[in-house]
Amino acid sequence: MDALCGSGELGSKFWDSNLSVHTENPDLTPCFQNSLLAWVPCIYLWVALPCYLLYLRHHCRGYIILSHLSKLKMVLGVLLWCVSWADLFYSFHGLVHGRAPAPVFFVTPLVVGVTMLLATLLIQYERLQGVQSSGVLIIFWFLCVVCAIVPFRSKILLAKAEGEISDPFRFTTFYIHFALVLSALILACFREKPPFFSAKNVDPNPYPETSAGFLSRLFFWWFTKMAIYGYRHPLEEKDLWSLKEEDRSQMVVQQLLEAWRKQEKQTARHKASAAPGKNASGEDEVLLGARPRPRKPSFLKALLATFGSSFLISACFKLIQDLLSFINPQLLSILIRFISNPMAPSWWGFLVAGLMFLCSMMQSLILQHYYHYIFVTGVKFRTGIMGVIYRKALVITNSVKRASTVGEIVNLMSVDAQRFMDLAPFLNLLWSAPLQIILAIYFLWQNLGPSVLAGVAFMVLLIPLNGAVAVKMRAFQVKQMKLKDSRIKLMSEILNGIKVLKLYAWEPSFLKQVEGIRQGELQLLRTAAYLHTTTTFTWMCSPFLVTLITLWVYVYVDPNNVLDAEKAFVSVSLFNILRLPLNMLPQLISNLTQASVSLKRIQQFLSQEELDPQSVERKTISPGYAITIHSGTFTWAQDLPPTLHSLDIQVPKGALVAVVGPVGCGKSSLVSALLGEMEKLEGKVHMKGSVAYVPQQAWIQNCTLQENVLFGKALNPKRYQQTLEACALLADLEMLPGGDQTEIGEKGINLSGGQRQRVSLARAVYSDADIFLLDDPLSAVDSHVAKHIFDHVIGPEGVLAGKTRVLVTHGISFLPQTDFIIVLADGQVSEMGPYPALLQRNGSFANFLCNYAPDEDQGHLEDSWTALEGAEDKEALLIEDTLSNHTDLTDNDPVTYVVQKQFMRQLSALSSDGEGQGRPVPRRHLGPSEKVQVTEAKADGALTQEEKAAIGTVELSVFWDYAKAVGLCTTLAICLLYVGQSAAAIGANVWLSAWTNDAMADSRQNNTSLRLGVYAALGILQGFLVMLAAMAMAAGGIQAARVLHQALLHNKIRSPQSFFDTTPSGRILNCFSKDIYVVDEVLAPVILMLLNSFFNAISTLVVIMASTPLFTVVILPLAVLYTLVQRFYAATSRQLKRLESVSRSPIYSHFSETVTGASVIRAYNRSRDFEIISDTKVDANQRSCYPYIISNRWLSIGVEFVGNCVVLFAALFAVIGRSSLNPGLVGLSVSYSLQVTFALNWMIRMMSDLESNIVAVERVKEYSKTETEAPWVVEGSRPPEGWPPRGEVEFRNYSVRYRPGLDLVLRDLSLHVHGGEKVGIVGRTGAGKSSMTLCLFRILEAAKGEIRIDGLNVADIGLHDLRSQLTIIPQDPILFSGTLRMNLDPFGSYSEEDIWWALELSHLHTFVSSQPAGLDFQCSEGGENLSVGQRQLVCLARALLRKSRILVLDEATAAIDLETDNLIQATIRTQFDTCTVLTIAHRLNTIMDYTRVLVLDKGVVAEFDSPANLIAARGIFYGMARDAGLA
């Protein structure tokens, strides 16, 4: 380098330490300034260029139009190039004229000139690639300015010293160069306009990071606008940014799915290659037999393949940050030596202070960008896992559903996916922690020599303990997750059947079950927490113990080893660095343990079998046929016997085919087979054209009526009007508060069963499909509506005429109008053909018609089929009881098919006017000008209130509530213990400072024992106090979890039915799962970390102020800055967290809704649409999640700047006051300041996390304080023993509405039912029949009037005293998972003989006795492994056991075939002959022998007399009887 400078004007030396270091006025040599210093920016740009060009090539955002800013940048670049070339030509000019400049004057202008030309070209290339702000060029211009500052100062000082400018030309060109690069730097900080095709031009609220400048991205300033806005106004969903394209669910899930499919293909190839050949020799067979089991697809590998690159980038940031963290201890060492050396130049100390600040700022920036990458990757983890699970849940087979309930799958989507998100920030610790430990040990070795090996040995001894804790924690985690799954599953069942629990007064039994599971869950949590606290002592003490052991060995191993300030506090700083990886290792192990459990669960679910999309072939089939089945054999699961055998069916195109047969013969299974829902064992199935499907029990979405009908299709007003008219929905629209924009509510809760079925049918009609599969759609409506629907929709004259229709039905009167009939028996086709042909055969079908057709028609059946052509439906609607829902379950399938009815509440709750239409359904034709109005929903059209995020700060009462739940004494004790541990920590370090000063006084060795002993005692005391605080917090946290869950559970179990009608079950379950999870496992650790960081920060500031009192001057401005950042951050992050919490519930509600309707979704080929809807809901959640992550980074930059200023001022004041400070105090002060950044940052983070997570307590308390129903027992007003003795029921001027503000559904009802009377209750749909029974049980409370039973006002007694004395057999039979005995007798009140007697009378004895488990036969969730008919018989057995004086039948036999119905009616007449029986009936023939019949019309008594008198009066009842063929 000296040769480049020559020996002339620049001198001959490249470096001169006397000029640059050992002086009070340092400078660099002219040679250094004109060579290396000028080349540094150029070297940087040329080194960065290849990678940057590669990046630009693969990240083109579209070109930016040439702007004035871009032109100005270009001009500056050209001018800089010209200045460099002017310097070069000036050197050549000197050479020509014999002055021979130094070689550097040729090389440097050439290098700088070419580099400036490169920078100019790069500006243009960046513009063409859409770069708005170039980080590479900003750094380049910044380096140019920084490197020019030294010669800028030197030239001025030289000119001042010499009194003249020695080289005017180069002096001038240099300052022109400086002005130009400074201008270029300033211009580079301004952003260009967005690219021509940028999303910002069309997106109203684009993600600001994409268009932010480099400095804004570097310091996260682009978030400041939201922080200020969030401080001034509570953030709402509309204020949130759109997501970047790469962060959207669709892209993330697709990438993960592709990686998972690749894993599955690799596994399939591996299995294929591992399969032994057919002709293997004996030796080969031995070898093959020893092969390992075939491997399974690895979800972990799929995750790494998808997100590995993000982890690699974050790992680079982490590596740089880890290396930088070891620079400050070395700078501290230099600073202490500087303090110890009074002869050292002052600028050394200021330089060290500046370098410590600069190093700390670089650490902060790099660490925050690392966290940004890693947390974003964590969110992508969660997004991808949720999306993959959602897609898998849409295609799992029925055999898988018995193993995976909706509750378990929701846990996979919520808890397990969240655990992967929580794990992401810790993953890099797998390599980072060992690296930091190794580097710390290396530098400690440099400082203390071999003595450090003693500390290392101690750390190695901790590893087995760590492993043992990990094993135990994993075992606890597995057990706890199983219990949590059981609790969530049971809670979903309780929500599903809450109405039944209330009707039977069974809440205490299920309350006891939930509390039993919860007790086991809390016991495991308590054990795990105590195990964790015992290790807390070890981990808290381990860095200190390592320090102590190392120092002890150091001072005792060699008498010449003296512990001075440099060795002690540099070692303490290194041990503080060591503390972080050691302290994070337990959290890493805990998170890895939890994630490994979750990984296994997710992988197991994703590896389950899927439905075969090729089981139903869509290719062209036999000409003229729409459906063909050839030799078809089907089963619901591979391990079960076939349900359908050897089917050979051909359905002509455009035909109307009826499928009939007895209960359990496989009618609904046939529909399922056609949909591809069953597993095909043999044969072929062909279907040509699109399919529409109407399940036996309607599946309704939680959206408007119109959206349910359109089902994703575009609105065609004419077809929409025709559909509503044909499905008899027009009159309903007039009654619904919001017309067709009325929100139907979750599971259609504000519609009657008939209305839900007609909406489901309307969905199929509007779809305009080619093939319609109708699974008994007429069973849920009365005979008049059924006839209307058949005539105008299904029949030969209906809107579906000409379409292929497969109708499962028991409506005898409709059969003559079908093209042909398929008769099933025992899963096989027993007869098939047109109606007349089947009659002529005189087979089982003809015999059945003769037995069960109405009397007046029997004589005509054998004459000709035309005699029945115009017959009315006689209300003999045999409801196929095989599938309780769309197609997922078969009649005789014993498998626990639990998914289908999870989260379902089969409610009879109706809209404000009851169940639907209140008058006959005439054929209503629309005039040309009459249209169904498609308008915005009326204000009262919404049923479910949208969940709103709370605004403002969390009320102090919420913190107080949690403190009371923990225990006030416990809370106080925890705080005092932390005060004690902080005092012990300060004492230990002050004692160490005094110990190091002994070296200056040359104290004797015998003083060392005292110093070491006190230091050890204080350190161990600190760890012991922290352990006690952790144990107290663990005990208090578990206590709080118990109290809060108990309050929530008890309130919800006592909530009125109206609460469940208007609150989505997903929202309630989210509270029981996610919010309780936060209370159980998140809050206590967050509080501990907050206390730890708070007392650490206070301790640091106290120590620094005590060491350097001058520091108090800057405390106030730094505190103001800190408070400002905290205030802006807290307001914004709190609201973002609330928005995230609120937007999470719809994800789970939609998921449960999707799984419930999976068969319908697949039938309509809308799986992809629902995946998009799910992705949209997840994206809505992410829109608050990403800003929340950025808010933490924005906070950290601000807070760590404050912390780094503390480091700067601590070092500066130590330099300024070095004459009055000893090295021990300086070491103590600065080493403490190096910790304050982390403590201050962590304190705000934990404060925010606490406020964010305490929202869970807020929600739990909110749901724990909702209005409850009346007391179960009123001690002062209990009915007498044996009440009611007679069973008299009297309504006195009784009126009722479903909720405040709605219209009355019963108006001034007055009637008297005598004891022992049999009263039938009839009326058109929506008349208020079911409402009347709900009032009797006080599910609905009176708006006016009263109900008296045996003279006692039911409003005066407790609900359980009332409900336990009444019995209902509901319309929708609900069973719970558990034994049959539990479903009949949850309290264990009856003997086994009584239960068998009830089963005998309810015609279930044969079935139950044939089961190996007998009464312990396990019912699946919802009783789905029993047919609907069998479940209804179980409800009859319940009624027989209760033996109450009043029995209510709510269309109880609607799901039973006629033969079973006759048996049940006979049982009721004999066993309840002395009881008062109230029957809501669709089949009028079942009540014709009743004492009286009550006819309701629009909530009032229209007729009330004996059936004979009512028929004679020729009123409403007469009309209904005539329609049914009974009059």
Swiss-Prot record:
Its EC number is 7.6.2.-, 7.6.2.2, 7.6.2.3. The modification Phosphoserine is found at residues 908, 911. It is an enzyme of class 7 (translocase). Residues 54-73, 121-132, 193-302, 371-426, 472-533, 598-963, 1043-1085, 1129-1199, 1244-1527 are cytoplasmic. It catalyses: taurocholate(in) + ATP + H2O = taurocholate(out) + ADP + phosphate + H(+); glycocholate(in) + ATP + H2O = glycocholate(out) + ADP + phosphate + H(+); taurolithocholate 3-sulfate(in) + ATP + H2O = taurolithocholate 3-sulfate(out) + ADP + phosphate + H(+); taurochenodeoxycholate 3-sulfate(in) + ATP + H2O = taurochenodeoxycholate 3-sulfate(out) + ADP + phosphate + H(+). ATP-dependent transporter of the ATP-binding cassette (ABC) family that binds and hydrolyzes ATP to enable active transport of various substrates including many drugs, toxicants and endogenous compound across cell membranes. Transports glucuronide conjugates such as bilirubin diglucuronide, estradiol-17-beta-o-glucuronide and GSH conjugates such as leukotriene C4 (LTC4). Transports also various bile salts (taurocholate, glycocholate, taurochenodeoxycholate-3-sulfate, taurolithocholate- 3-sulfate). Mainly expressed in the liver. Also expressed in small intestine, colon, prostate, testis, brain and at a lower level in the kidney. In testis, localized to peritubular myoid cells, Leydig cells, along the basal membrane of Sertoli cells and moderately in the adluminal compartment of the seminiferous tubules. GO terms for cellular component: basal plasma membrane; basolateral plasma membrane; ciliary basal body; membrane; plasma membrane. One of its GO terms (biological process) is transport across blood-brain barrier. Residues 629-851, 1291-1523 form the ABC transporter domain. ATP 1 binds at residues 661-668. Changing residue 1297 to H: Does not affect subcellular localizattion; does not affect the transport of monoglucuronosyl bilirubin, bisglucuronosyl bilirubin, leukotriene C4, dehydroepiandrosterone-3-sulfate and 17-beta-glucuronosyl oestradiol. Residues 311-594, 971-1252 form the ABC transmembrane type-1 domain. Glycans are attached at residues 18, 1006-1007. CDD domains: ABC_6TM_MRP1_2_3_6_D1_like (cd18595), ABC_6TM_MRP1_2_3_6_D2_like (cd18603), ABCC_MRP_domain1 (cd03250), ABCC_MRP_domain2 (cd03244). This is ATP-binding cassette sub-family C member 3.
